[in-house]
Amino acid sequence: MKYSFIRYAADNFAEVFYITKIKKKMVNLFQYNTRRLFIFINRKIITFLFTLLIIPCFFSCDSSNYNQQISVDGLQEPVEILRDQWGINHIYAKNQHDLFFAQGYAAAKDRLFQFEIWRRQATGTVAEILGEKELKRDIGTRLFKFRGDLTQELNHYHEDGVEIITAYTNGVNAYIEEVLGTPDQLPIEFKLLNIVPEKWTPDVVISRHQGLLGNIGEELRIGRAVAKLGVKTVKDLSWFHPKDPDINLDPSIDKDLLFDDILELYNAYRKVVRFQDSDIQPEYRTSENVNALLVLNEGKDDPFSIGSNNWVVSGALMADGNTYMANDPHRTIAVPSLRYMTHLVAPGWNVIGGGEPEIPGVSIGHNEYGSWGLTVFRTDGEDMYIYNLNPNNSNQYKYNGEWVNMTIISETIKVKGKDDISVDLKYTKHGPVTYVDKVHNIAYAIRCAWLEPGGSPYLASLRMDQSKTWEEFREACNYSHIPGENMIWADKEGNIGWQAVGIAPIRTNFSGLVPVPGDGRYEWDGYLPINEKPNTLNPPEGFFATANQNVTPNDYKRWNAIGFSWSDPYRGDRVNEVLGSAKKITMDDMKALQVDYLSIPARILIPLLDGLSFAGKSAEAKNKLNGWDYKLEPNSIEAAIYVAFENQIRLLANHKFIPETGKDFITSIQMKKLLDWIITPDDRFGSNPILGRDQFLSKAFNKGIKYLEETLGDDLNNWQYGQEKFKHTYMAHALGKFVNEETKAKLDIGPLPRGGNAYTPGSTGGNNRQSSGASFRMIVNTGNWDDAVSTNGPGQSGNPESPFYSNLFEPWAKDQYFPVYYSRIKIDSVTVNKTLLNPKK
């Protein structure tokens, strides 16, 4: 007899546990016959009910059932890891410690090179392997290191945070010890760079270096743009909403000094690791002369191209009557995938989904009660402060009329091929000092809400992973500080909800969109309690969707604690359009919406061509658009014509409307702003706005057609969207460009055709080669957990030798899904490898 799960849950004065029995059927299928036994026992009398009431037969009594058994130092009891055919590890442990130990072990085994680079980024030790070119990064990393109480920090993310995170890093280290015993088993990247992995500590897990942290780069760009162009012009070219922010620079700020490299250390800390051919061992190096650099992990996304979609739908709109959750976070398309999927099962835990590879838990997924997902909710958690320094002591700054000493911390950094370098890290009361102008006695520091306890991105998902109700989920959301997110929830009781999260400074007398003096006049008035951020439960529409656009209700009162800059609304508009008109929605409908390529901008722009005259190839192309459905599908000629047209509109608009002196600071105009101008033209198009607008569109269309002719030839039939020359995906490994062809073939993946663009729900940003979008997607049916589906391209593993390195690339590129099984019987049916981890005796 097998028991599917034993749940131990401690409530305030009671222990509640649910026992679910599996009954065998004649055709070797199992149905759940669930009985809930509620036993209420005063916690003051019994503080601990059981360690194992019944050992669930997750563990086979026959050792021959396992592909391998491994003895691991640090485990308390055996742990079973079942790997399914898509590469997901289903981890079954008998206690919480072993569960997260095994998660760390398995994740490190799959992503060891990614883990080692992450560790070096997190600890400021990249220069130790890549030399002096990475010194600024290491200084920045140490400057922005969390230096608060570690126990308080770890327990912020979960009441057992110290145990969970320490167990996770010990699991990582157990695998590192194991593989160092057989170094020939190290992934090839270690051989290419001639390095070995080193041990982790909890400090690595809580690093903030690659989180979506705030807007400090935008803040400085706006400040510089105001200095060059003035407030009126900057506001005209920007799309600030829903309120009108004050972006005036304080009169005491010397505008000319804003153009120094103020954020050099911050940007170095935040940027991805860049390799050069000289980093590669000679025997693997390409013979070509390579000057270009490639990146590892995630590129620096444009603030408004970072996107995601999620939505929850009530059972009233679904054909089967169940609530559903769908989520597809959009980030840089990379190898390995930015998300890592896992299934964690132990007393008190049964959660499955995707998360950041380097942290414990699951950030997008479901447990046996509900499902949740996330998108970015614009929250400004950073500000730049400018200080006057004491001419007689550059380590003192003026604050509230007095000279105040900076805090100084000395660090020593190892640099490959050089002597160790000592640096002094300086801090004001607001935060790290990133730049000192010694000539003008000016210093700049960044106040970062994410340096408060709880600033590690996504790690508070640990609390969400055990939520049983909407109320418990909202309580867990209170601990989710970074990034600002739209958290959605759907549960099997029929509830759907939305809660915006993220640590949000309250600014009472400034907007946070431009630098301010650090003299005491511009201070934060605490932080907005997260449960006071916008939220809703069971909206009357029967669904709720977010796509990084502003979804804050108009009657919301706390505008001084949320952002003024949001993504274009078109992805969200399309999702709302489909869900708002649908009845009896199915899982197939949900899949189709996640990869929907209908372009609302196309639906706006193409009809405006009707009254315009064209000749030659442009006329032929315009006629081709008659009756088009506005979908940017692969192999579509119409899609190719439109995208070439749209690209030229943006290029011409940037050239025409952004003054030359501001082009370095305002690099583009948001599509929503631009389309508003085009729909209702004014004198920016000339004395006859409609004629000027039409001439602008004609020029853009002709230039788009010329581009297609030059790129794809004269034959219109060859102008197909979704090909290597025009919209494809190619996942280039960070080292691929610098190695010989044999090695490169192992590392790089692709190309394959893609559809869509940055403004379609099926988002594929990045012009001709997709560079951003949803490499991970998940849809959950709360009435049947085994009905969940997902995709995670290019694969679960980061090891090029693994069969799970690129097995999901083609299905992902073709917008296909695989099942994410939850029940043991279903998981057993697709298991391809069974590992038993035993405590080392």
Name the predicted role of every residue range.
Residues A346, V351-E356, G365-Y369, L374-G518:
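Glycine- and hydrophobic-rich flexible loops that cap the catalytic core of alpha/beta enzyme folds
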Residues F100-A102, D149-V162, R447, Y458-M464, ...:
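Second-shell loop/turn segments in exported
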Residues M1-N42:
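N-terminal secretory signal peptides that target proteins for export/translocation
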Residues E382, I442, I482-A582, I649:
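Hydrophobic alpha-helical segments
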Residues F58-S60:
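C-terminal motif of bacterial Sec signal peptides marking the signal peptidase cleavage site
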Residues N65-Y324, P329-T332:
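Substrate-recognition/specificity elements adjacent to catalytic centers across diverse enzyme folds
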Residues A561, S565-S618, K703-K841:
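Terminal end segments
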